[in-house]
Every structure is written in structure tokens, then in C-alpha cells.
From Swiss-Prot:
Protein name (Swiss-Prot/TrEMBL): Peroxisomal membrane protein PEX16
Peroxisomal side: 111-114
A single cellular component GO annotation: peroxisomal membrane
Gene responsible for this protein: pex16
Basic and acidic residues composition bias: residue spans: 196-215
Length: 340
């Protein structure tokens, strides 16, 4: 009985993989539909926030699953990438579920369990990132850890690889390319559209550079990245020591982030992905204006006044400003929205 259900499950899994490979656009539309559903659910009924976050997490996991299927089938990463890719995938799963786990733990078991769940998640993430940094030489680690695929570019590249010089015929008058029967791919690898003829230039799918080993950071660069990785743990420990209303945890976290960014800015020969991640971290320093206790003492009254003025005097802005004003207190109570 169990073997029969297992066979059915494997058959269903294979059918879904074939569907994603043959219809990546349809898979993308499915992910967007699930994500849109999470927005529609929010605020509709009691416990809608938890359900909305669950659906949103499911959409992120679905995108991660579909990217993994396409990456394995169409890009064929080398076997040596397997263990590193699994660590990145688990890191992506944790980041996709962290908000739902936090609010679910708070709802089911209370605030102490919520903080325990937050600490466990941050410890797991830090351990995975430390292994990637020191064992796999991952360099500056980006967020999200698994770079989303350029699916259209990968499909076109897969077609380019399958369309060698003798694999298709190009009509002289119509310039239309037609595959030969001998060189047609198997049914689950076949793309049901006309082959494209290119000038031989390699397409950039967004995968090549981001999947390479990180740049050589050197001693100071590695120390700076380790500071960035351990900053959430340090912040949680300082919260436990001085309390949530103290300025000390806020200042310690800000000092660690600024120190890490300053040291990493001096590292040369960073890849394009690493430079983009460094710019993202610089921009995220603005989040400290929205983090307590700075938010409670300075930002809250000014931000609410600005949103109220925009909502009252700028046509159409109120549709966004008023729900945002209502949501800000909820957003402030969720740790991973602020400090994740």
C-alpha cells in the first residue's frame, strides 16, 4: 500500500517537473497567482495575516522549487556544486519561512516561544553562511542566497545549444528556421516554438557569474563578512542583555553593519554580483530609521504625518498611504520584517 502511494507520488512529481520544463512561463504565472492570493487574503478576516504570510511563503518556496528544476535540467551544474547548492537552497528555505514561523510561534505558543524560534532560525542561518564563507569561499553572500533565474534567457540559451549548425534548415526566401527530425530533442526537453538563429554570442542568463566562487576577500574582507553574518546573533544577545527599549542593541547592530560595509568597500576585484550586494547593504542602512527605538522616538510621528498629508491632499495616494499607516504598527512588531 505504502509503495503504491510512493510510486504515485513520484509519478506526480515527475509530471510536475516535466510541466515546469516545458512551460516555464506557466510556472511563473502560477507563482505570481499564489503571491497575488496572499495580498488578497490579507486583512479579510481573523487570522488572515498568518494565512496571508503562509501563502506568500508558499509562493517563494514554489519559485525556489521551479528554479531548481530548471537549473538542474537546463544548466546541468557540475557535481562539485551539489553540496554548495544544497546549502544555498536550505538557506533560501529558511529565509522564505522565517516570518511565518515567527508569527505562527507567537500565535500558537506566545512571545517567549517566538523569541526562541527567532534565535534558532538566526543560528541556523549563521551556521550555513559561515560554512559557505570559510569552506566554500563564497565571498560576499547575497540575499536571496539563490539568485532567481532569468528563465527566458536560459530557455533561449538551451535552444541555442540544441540548434547547432546542422540541426536546422533556414529558408532562403522566408529566413525561417526549421528543425530537422533527426536533431529534435526528446519530448520533455523540447520547446514548442521556432528555433532562433543567433550570431554565436553567449547569452547572459544571470547565472554564470553569480554561481561562481566568490572573490578572494583577504583577511579583512573575510572578517568583515563574518561580522555581517554574526550581526543578527549579536543583536539578539544584546536585546536579551539590555532589553528592547534600550538604545544599546540598536547602536551595536548599526556599528557592526557600518564596520562591515566599510571594510568590504576596500576590497578590490569584487564581482558584479558582490558589488550589487554591497550597494544593497548600504541602502539597507536606511532601515535603521525604521527600527526601534529610533522609530519610536523620531521617525514614527514624522512618517505618519507625511503619509496623512499625502493621503489627504494628493489624489490617489490615499489608496496606498492609509493602508500603510494601518500596517506600520503590525510591521514594527515582527522581528524579521525589521531585522531579518
Amino acid at each position: 500500500m505504502a509503495a503504491r502511494y510512493w510510486d504515485k507520488l513520484q509519478d506526480l512529481s515527475q509530471k510536475y517537473k516535466d510541466y515546469v520544463i516545458q512551460n516555464p512561463t506557466g510556472a511563473t504565472q502560477l507563482e505570481s497567482a499564489v503571491r497575488m492570493l496572499s495580498y488578497l487574503i490579507a486583512g479579510r478576516f481573523a487570522d488572515s495575516h498568518e494565512l496571508s504570510e503562509l501563502v506568500y511563503s508558499a509562493s517563494n518556496l514554489l519559485a525556489l522549487l521551479n528554479d531548481g528544476i530548471l537549473r538542474k535540467e537546463l544548466l546541468a551544474p557540475p557535481p562539485t556544486e551539489g553540496s554548495r547548492r544544497r546549502l544555498l537552497t536550505w538557506l533560501g528555505v529558511l529565509e522564505s519561512l522565517e516570518v511565518f514561523i515567527e508569527i505562527g510561534a507567537a500565535r500558537a505558543w506566545g512571545d517567549r516561544t517566538r523569541w526562541a524560534a527567532i534565535l534558532i532560525i538566526q543560528l541556523l542561518k549563521a551556521c550555513l553562511r559561515i560554512v559557505l564563507l570559510f569552506w566554500y569561499r563564497a565571498g560576499i553572500q547575497s540575499s536571496p542566497p539563490v539568485t532567481p533565474l532569468d528563465r527566458e534567457g536560459i530557455l533561449n540559451q538551451a535552444e541555442d545549444n540544441s540548434n547547432s549548425g546542422s540541426s536546422c534548415f533556414v529558408g532562403r526566401r522566408s529566413s525561417r528556421a526549421v528543425r530537422s527530425l533527426d536533431d529534435s530533442a526528446s519530448s520533455h526537453r523540447r520547446f514548442w516554438r521556432s528555433p532562433q538563429i543567433h550570431d554565436g554570442k553567449q547569452r547572459n542568463t544571470g547565472e554564470t557569474e553569480s554561481d561562481k566562487d566568490g572573490s578572494e576577500l583577504g583577511t579583512l574582507g573575510t572578517l568583515a563578512e563574518a561580522i555581517h553574518i554574526l550581526r543578527p546573533i549579536t543583536h539578539l544577545l544584546s536585546l536579551a542583555t539590555w532589553g528592547q527599549k534600550s538604545w544599546k542593541p540598536w547602536m551595536v547592530a548599526a556599528a557592526l553593519d557600518i564596520t562591515s560595509i566599510s571594510l568590504l568597500s576596500d576590497v578590490r576585484n569584487l564581482s558584479h554580483r558582490e558589488r550589487a550586494e554591497l550597494r544593497r547593504r548600504m541602502f539597507l542602512l536606511l532601515y535603521y530609521l525604521l527600527r526601534s527605538p529610533f522609530y519610536n522616538h523620531y521617525t514614527e510621528t514624522r512618517l505618519l504625518l507625511l503619509l496623512r498629508l499625502l493621503g489627504d491632499y494628493v489624489p490617489g495616494v490615499g489608496l496606498v498611504a492609509r493602508p500603510l499607516m494601518d500596517y506600520l504598527p503590525v510591521w514594527q512588531k515582527i522581528y524579521f520584517y525589521n531585522w531579518g
